[in-house]
Amino acid sequence: MTGLRQIAFYGKGGIGKSTTSQNTLAALVEKGQKILIVGCDPKADSTRLILNAKAQDTVLSLAAEAGSVEDLELEEVLKIGYKGIKCVESGGPEPGVGCAGRGVITSINFLEENGAYDDVDYVSYDVLGDVVCGGFAMPIRENKAQEIYIVMSGEMMALYAANNIAKGILKYAHSGGVRLGGLICNERQTDRELDLAEALAKRLNSQLIHFVPRDNIVQHAELRRQTVIQYAPDSAQAGEYRKLAEKVHANAGKGTIPTPITMEELEQMLLDFGIMKTEEQQLAELAAKEAAKAAAALR
């Protein structure tokens, strides 16, 4: 296990985290890297594009059928996908029942004990990032993931989630070896998105690893349950994911301890970039609209 890179992709739900991570890993495996993916999202969609299949059975659901995790064999939970990538989904309980994070803890312990981490160059955790609760923070807290990549966009909630995740990393950075590898911006075509992503990365004492342009080919590939790397290997978008993979690969040991900012500082940043309006601006716009309405009514 010498030189094993344990990385994690965090990000708010719906940001394209699983798509980004699977395309990046598909590009890495093309470089001859051996990879294990551990899905830590209750949606269990972290391996779908690598397996070209519907969501795979999760460790928790298989354990429930078998009686307990101890009754499982590694072969039952580990599936082999694109170019030999090993895939596992930890899963979660029914909505509203229990802690989804517990599935993450159970899975990682089971995989380690059964030798799933042997003979791989990368272990990649794909983690829900809206809530950095104990279970979802497990890969950080237990010093499993050493490099965290935050998938975000120029939308306010994605920036807010990125800052929150940075707080989670900072909490465990001194007790463990976890570092922020950088931000990955999934373009949503919002105003000044690249500038904003670079500015946030700088404020967090990090770097913008890559700006992934928006391209409908990603959706076309997803409908066929494939990564862009597999579906359209010669496309410009596949080239973007290869660039991202190259940057992640070259980023070993370059992670930083993040410097998260306050909510007020984040809002000020959005105001400075003209993304958010002050109350005065909003009131002035409202007054102008009302005046225009009143003038129109008098005509």
From Swiss-Prot:
The keyword DNA-binding does not apply. Its EC number is 1.18.6.1. [4Fe-4S] cluster binds at residues 99, 133. The reversible ADP-ribosylation of Arg-102 inactivates the nitrogenase reductase and regulates nitrogenase activity. ATP binds at residues 11-18. Its cofactor is [4Fe-4S] cluster. Belongs to the NifH/BchL/ChlL family. This is Nitrogenase iron protein. It comes from Methylobacterium nodulans (strain LMG 21967 / CNCM I-2342 / ORS 2060). The gene is nifH.
